[in-house]
A protein has these predicted regions:
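Non-catalytic interface/linker regions that flank or bridge core catalytic/transmembrane domains
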Residues: 1-127
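Short alpha-helical scaffolding segments that buttress acidic/His motifs in well-ordered protein cores
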Residues: 101-104, 115-119, 139, 156-160, ...
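Alpha-helical phosphate/pyrophosphate-handling elements in metalloenzyme active cores
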Residues: 125-156, 195, 201, 230-235
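Conserved hydrophobic/aromatic pocket- or pore-lining residues that grip, position, or stack substrates
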Residues: 135, 139, 163, 189
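Divalent metal-dependent phosphate-bond-processing catalytic cores, especially two-metal-ion Mg2+/Mn2+ enzymes
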Residues: 144-148, 205-206, 243-246
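Histidine/acidic-rich helix-loop-helix segments that form or flank divalent-metal centers
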Residues: 160, 201-240
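Short active-site segment of divalent metal-dependent hydrolases/proteases
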Residues: 166-167
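Divalent-cation-assisted or electrostatically stabilized phosphate/pyrophosphate-binding catalytic cores
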Residues: 177-198, 223-248
Length: 248
């Protein structure tokens, strides 16, 4: 059983955004070797990009015909890896998630293409992973609209991509129930931010308190009528405020 986390400390200042060189696979955004920054999340310098290839389809397919569809595929694949790591009680690096978010914001036109993917009607067989990809896109668009700097956008994107991991602790019956939930089921659903926070701190420790806090505060609201703590205004993580707005 995961240990109860200690109270959150203030978010540490982000390190300078240095670049590191990675060569992306052919056919994906950023084909030219490019300078990449040292992780703004935590830990040592991150490793190279994973391959994410696009599948062939007819030109009417809004996914296959989108030049950034590989980012959607990589996002979904990462979510699956993260959920599997939780199931196996393993630690997974966030390097791949950081690379995905960086590629989303690196080129000015990328976000419009990604938004097209997010609003497309897609099969629901991978509904949670697709929801998290869509949520990341919406969150990043909001962050860009607020003129957030690159380091904050990367943290925002990573947090939004995994913000619902606490749902793993909710019974499948409730998660997949059609129709109205009972008051007891609603109460169980409302525990998932706590589960998510515990998962992050268990995996990554206090160095990632900012991420645990973003996930824990996602359902808090400015007027204090959210949950689980009823926080308001400045008590709520700035990342969580954006994540909450984008959660559709």
């Amino acid at each position: 059983q995961l240990a109860a986390p200690s109270p959150f400390a203030p978010e540490p200042p982000a390190p300078p955004a240095e670049r590191r060189t990675n060569e992306a696979p052919a056919g994906t955004p950023g084909e030219e070797p490019k300078k990449r920054r040292r992780s703004v999340l935590a830990g040592p310098e991150y490793s190279a990009l994973n391959d994410g290839s696009e599948s062939d389809s007819n030109l009417l397919d809004p996914i296959a015909n989108n030049p950034y569809s590989s980012l959607r595929d990589r996002s979904i694949e990462f979510v699956f890896k993260f959920l599997q790591a939780i199931a196996n009680d393993e630690v997974i690096s966030l390097d791949e998630a950081e690379d995905i978010v960086y590629d989303c914001i690196e080129e000015p036109e990328a976000m419009e293409h990604l938004y097209t993917l997010a609003v497309s009607v897609i099969d629901t067989s991978n509904s949670m992973a697709i929801h998290l990809f869509n949520h990341m896109v919406y969150s990043l668009k909001l962050g860009q609209g607020l003129k957030w700097p690159e380091d904050r956008l990367i943290r925002l994107g990573v947090a939004s991509l995994i913000h619902d991991v606490g749902m793993c602790g909710i019974s499948q019956h409730i998660r997949h129930k059609e129709g109205k939930l009972t008051s007891e089921e609603i109460a169980e659903i409302r525990v998932h931010p706590q589960y998510g926070m515990e998962i992050i701190l268990h995996m990554f420790g206090d160095q990632f308190q900012w991420l645990a806090e973003a996930i824990y505060h996602e359902h808090e609201r400015e007027n204090g009528r959210g949950y689980p703590q009823g926080l308001s205004g400045g008590e709520i993580s700035e990342y969580a405020k954006i994540i909450g707005l984008a959660d559709v």
